[in-house]
Amino acid sequence: MAAAGGGWAAACEKFRSARTLSAVESRKDPETEPYRSKYSARALLQEVKQQLSAAEDCGEARLLAVRRAVLEYELGVNHTDTEELSAGEEHLQRCTQLLEPHRLSRDCVSLYIQAQNNLGILWSERDEIKTAQTYLESAEALYNQYMKEDGNPPLDPSEHFMAEEEKLTDQERSKRFEKAYTHTLYYLAQVYQHLEMIEKAAQYCHTTLKRQLEYCGYYPVEWALNAATLSQYYLSKQCFMESRHCLAAASVIFSQAGQVPSTEDNETEQDQQDLRQRKAEIARCWIKYCLNLLQSARKLLEDNIGELDPDRQLELKAQRKKEEDEKENGRKKAVLFGTSDICDSVLAMEEKVSSVYPLDFQEAREIFLVGQNYVQEAKEFFQVDGYVTDHIEIVQDHSALFKVLAFFEEDYERRCKMHKRRIDMLEPIYADLNPQYYLLISRQLQFELADTYYEMMDLKVAIGNRLEELDSHTIKKINSLAQLAIKYYELFLDSLRNPDKVFPEELEEDVLRPAMVAKFHIARLYGKLITSDSKKQLENMQTSLEYYTFLVDYCEKHPDAVRAVETELELSKEMVGLLPTRMERLRAKLCPFI
């Protein structure tokens, strides 16, 4: 067939036209005929296939087999694109069968890997993930074997239908081959994620992202979102340096997205909306980063009553000073993204926020402020009107940032003001929320508001204890905060009642601990209310006893619940033993002659 120059040139032209129809013209197909160009491409490929069949007796068996394999591959992808998976599978299988004896040769290896990639995708779409894994791992192994045994840039499949003078340079061949292998790793990352092999999925995702930058084969928005998602994996492993690096790279690469002109002007408005949403999603990942770093530092620094341990703080500061010199070496071992110019931008981005545990208020505040900036950025897109759940989650994260910052603040008054900021942001959104439609979020807000008022009350009591005598203003404030905490805890507990307002005999596992903690805190809050009226004091003690008793009785009836509230149960048992005696003493004072 090579000798029949005119016929071969025509076949090459048809092949090129088919690829153009599939890759370019198909984008312009009307909605009524979404696959018009794909079907036209298929017809051309079938014509070329017939021409090859007619030339089978020309003696160039190996060459013809490879060219037929290219056509089977193109037809396989074409049928898959038009959702004809069975036909697509047949063509792709024929492709690999034709190439099997020569799969490690320079003219076949790239095509064989791409066919296996597409078989992997095809089986993934059928939800046969294990089968997909087999094909993709086979493609990965073949790439590694070829690079070890040969390593020269192999032919691109399209070159089998090109004149000699049109053939690609080695540089272009290498780029296309590496891109095919990057796709293998990308699909493997998804397969491992699906199979819940999370660590392996993260490793493959990181390698894919790195290679996409190296070979300039990526869409900025998609790349940035994948990097931001990967950052959350590293966050779950407490690998803050790696998490920050992924997020910094995501922000830098995302900034390129606005510089890429839209291919279709009529989609520009939607494109801009999508860009704003993606930017807000990356901002939310940054919020989680700052919040997790602060919360992890708190766990390291807190004592057994949840306060900052000064000895532990000094110990960690000394340890960190010792490790400063090793920091640079560790940095170089981290997997870095991109070429030198991208690396410079990423490193500049990283310098805006620490990746080491903050050990005092000033360090914590710097991380808090970065997180707060991203809260504002995320809220610009995720507004209450249209994104209720997302908006509330962002506000909850903002509240959590204030909560953890308050831990580092030594001054009780200033700490109280931080909790007041939380109240000011949470109460308005709770007031506007319909619990009928947003029951879970409503419960979360009730509990958080109750907890915040509870914490403020504790702080006001601690401030009052420093005074020689409690003044009426402080007493009023303590009582007001306690009553507001009780109000929100009761609202939370009421939300657990059935339509007949009856509290459940047995609590669901997801609400067991919050409900028990709410009961325990209400018991304690009634004990904290300050009154000069002994009768009222007795009533409060009685209510307090009832709530403590509920917790003790519930755990006796449901022993499985004990693990969830061990500390609270121990203290409740103690109070159930002490309170009746105290109440008797108080009654004796009220009625001395009885």
UniProtKB/Swiss-Prot annotation:
GO CC aspect terms: cytoskeleton; mitochondrion
SUPFAM superfamilies the UniProt entry points to: TPR-like
GO molecular function, one term: protein sequestering activity
Cellular compartments annotated: Cytoplasm, Cytoskeleton
Pfam families per UniProt: KBP_C
Alphabetical list of PANTHER family matching this protein: KIF-BINDING PROTEIN, KIF1-BINDING PROTEIN
Similarity-based family: Belongs to the KIF-binding protein family.
The name this protein goes by in its record: KIF-binding protein
Originating species: Gallus gallus
UniProt lineage: Eukaryota, Metazoa, Chordata, Craniata, Vertebrata
